[in-house]
């Protein structure tokens, strides 16, 4: 739930599978990164999960980074796809900075001028399941980039074992318990956010995503979901 779009578990699972299947159809390799850039939304979260289900590695990029830094992160990650929203797409286009040759998919709506398809049009047909990829504890789960305040942002690779450990801690903390919602008010490129998000999803919880932090809205959501 991001305030504009709400999905049940069944709906989310079907969409994640369709996105993952299309990533595989377009050649996503085991452990290969999938770059994601944009405001935190339900669809952003779906792409993040689909990259992992497809056997790849999610690479959420910092929205506050400069175009030059973003281009460097995309190249460093080794991604073949960039999932992006219109706000960030316009910023990058206006900057004139050359970007790596990635397949662009729009998270929020199609961009015919750039030839970038809309996520829900691009993904595989309903009912198409991704091929199961055998992964181990040391295989990459996601790449988190440093802030870059002292230079080019550095990629920090988290293994699947590391995230599994966080999921186990989340279970002990009650994340995913019946009737409990997790309110996430920080961006999904933040490791703090992701640690709580993946644990919530691992145990069938409800994740409530804030596109941008707003104190009054946060209090309203906290009252609504407590």
Give, region by region, the residue ranges found by the protein language model.
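Conserved pre-ATP/AMP-binding loop-to-beta segment of ANL
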Residues: 126-145, 152, 175-181
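Conserved structural elements of the adenylate-forming
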Residues: 13-18, 137, 156-177, 185, ...
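Conserved adenylate-forming
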Residues: 67-68, 75, 95-114, 202-206, ...
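Conserved AMP-binding/adenylation subdomain of ANL enzymes
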Residues: 164-181, 189-226
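AMP-dependent adenylate-forming
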Residues: 1-8, 114
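Conserved AMP-binding A3 loop
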Residues: 6-10, 141-165
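Conserved AMP-binding/adenylate-forming
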Residues: 3-5, 20-68, 187
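ANL superfamily adenylate-forming
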Residues: 81, 87-137
């Amino acid at each position: 739930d991001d305030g504009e779009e709400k999905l049940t578990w069944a709906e989310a699972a079907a969409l994640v599978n369709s996105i993952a299947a299309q990533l595989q159809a377009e050649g996503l390799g085991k452990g290969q990164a999938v770059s994601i850039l944009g405001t935190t939304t339900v669809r952003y979260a779906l792409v993040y999960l689909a990259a992992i289900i497809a056997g790849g590695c999610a690479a959420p990029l910092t929205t506050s980074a400069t175009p030059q830094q973003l281009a460097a992160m995309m190249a460093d990650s080794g991604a073949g796809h960039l999932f992006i929203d219109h706000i960030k797409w316009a910023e990058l286009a206006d900057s004139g900075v050359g970007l790596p040759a990635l397949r662009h998919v729009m998270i929020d709506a199609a961009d015919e001028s750039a030839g970038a398809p809309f996520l829900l049009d691009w993904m595989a047909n309903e009912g198409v399941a991704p091929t199961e990829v055998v992964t181990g504890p040391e295989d990459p789960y996601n790449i988190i980039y440093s802030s870059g305040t002292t230079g080019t942002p550095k990629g920090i690779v988290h293994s699947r074992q590391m995230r599994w450990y966080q999921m186990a801690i989340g279970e002990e903390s009650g994340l995913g318990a019946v009737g409990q919602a997790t309110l996430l008010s920080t961006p999904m490129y933040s490791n703090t956010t992701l640690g709580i998000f993946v644990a919530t999803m691992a145990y069938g919880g409800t994740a409530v995503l804030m596109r941008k932090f707003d104190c009054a809205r946060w209090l309203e959501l906290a009252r609504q979901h407590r």
